[in-house]
């Protein structure tokens, strides 16, 4: 696709209309009786641009034209460009934690605490609601000890997060798919995340509900979301099993899921974290996948 041709205008109406025909039926099946239906604010992770050569500014132009509202994990230097095109930082990093050495490493808490506080300040500065903190690898540690350690450090900073109005969020990952390189993560099942949230006991303690990982480890995507919405501040989507586009080449019905999200009253971002499939155009895929969630 010629980038100038695309940037001159995007014609997504026919696809949106085609998808819209069945939305009222799906909504009726998923809508809780007391929920206020919320429009879905869509964001993206950098993975959706795999194999492309667009500059960051060109990416922002494309996303803005398609109707996206945010970008996950931008650098602080990229924020002015985001805002130039009406996009928001949906989630930021900057806590000192990593997939290897995370919140459960008690010996690193003295390092993590000031970093998390600084990350909260950064989120306030750039206008981002969510700060991600990673639980890390077990390396022989029991899940119980991991939950205790994670809750301990998060409890030390929860007051500051509450004061500043910033969500602290942990992301679930799967431990089954070797190619995803996360086989030893302590937070590989929803129950562990809910447990930590309950221990911390703060309205600012949340999780990133990554539907790709949840489907692999827990399943029951919609019910788990609806039953634990108070602990969810951010959602990631990707096709299962390939982690590619969220269309009908994959096992999850994301149109149905999108209606369930909208009907639940969830008002956070839903971020695309898939990679374009072989031979597929990233921009066309973004357009199509945006339409699937645009309910």
Predicted regions and their residues:
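Alpha-helical scaffolding segments of alpha/beta enzyme cores, especially the outer helices
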Residues: 58, 77-80, 84, 114, ...
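Catalytic domains of carbohydrate-active enzymes, especially glycoside hydrolases
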Residues: 58-78
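Residue-level detector of anion-binding/catalytic polar loops
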Residues: 69-70, 88, 129, 167, ...
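Histidine-acidic metal/acid-base catalytic patches
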Residues: 2-65, 127-129, 187-209, 213-295
């Amino acid at each position: 696709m010629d980038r100038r041709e695309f940037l001159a205008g995007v014609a997504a109406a026919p696809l949106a209309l085609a998808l819209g025909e069945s939305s009222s039926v799906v909504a009726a099946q998923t809508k809780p009786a007391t929920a206020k239906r919320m429009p879905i604010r869509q964001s993206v992770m950098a993975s959706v641009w795999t194999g492309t050569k667009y500059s960051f500014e060109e990416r922002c132009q494309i996303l803005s034209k398609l109707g996206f509202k945010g970008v996950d994990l931008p650098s602080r230097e990229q924020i002015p460009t985001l805002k130039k095109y009406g996009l928001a930082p949906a989630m930021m990093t900057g806590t000192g934690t990593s997939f290897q050495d995370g919140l459960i490493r008690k010996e690193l808490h003295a390092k993590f605490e000031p970093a998390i506080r600084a990350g909260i300040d950064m989120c306030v500065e750039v206008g981002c609601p969510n700060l991600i903190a990673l639980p890390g690898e077990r390396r022989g540690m029991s899940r119980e000890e991991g939950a205790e350690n994670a809750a301990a450090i998060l409890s030390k900073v929860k007051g500051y997060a509450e004061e500043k109005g910033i969500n602290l969020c942990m992301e679930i990952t799967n431990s089954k798919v070797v190619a995803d390189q996360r086989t030893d993560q302590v937070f590989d099942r929803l129950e562990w995340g809910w447990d930590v949230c309950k221990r911390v006991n703060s309205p600012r303690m949340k999780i990133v509900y990554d539907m790709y990982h949840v489907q692999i480890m827990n399943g029951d995507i919609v019910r788990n979301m609806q039953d634990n919405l108070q602990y969810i501040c951010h959602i990631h989507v990707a096709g299962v099993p390939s982690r590619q586009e969220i269309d009908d080449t994959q096992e999850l019905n994301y149109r149905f899921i999108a209606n369930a999200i909208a009907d639940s009253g969830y008002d956070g971002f839903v971020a695309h974290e898939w990679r374009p499939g072989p031979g597929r155009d990233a921009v066309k895929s973004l357009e199509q996948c945006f339409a699937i969630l645009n309910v």
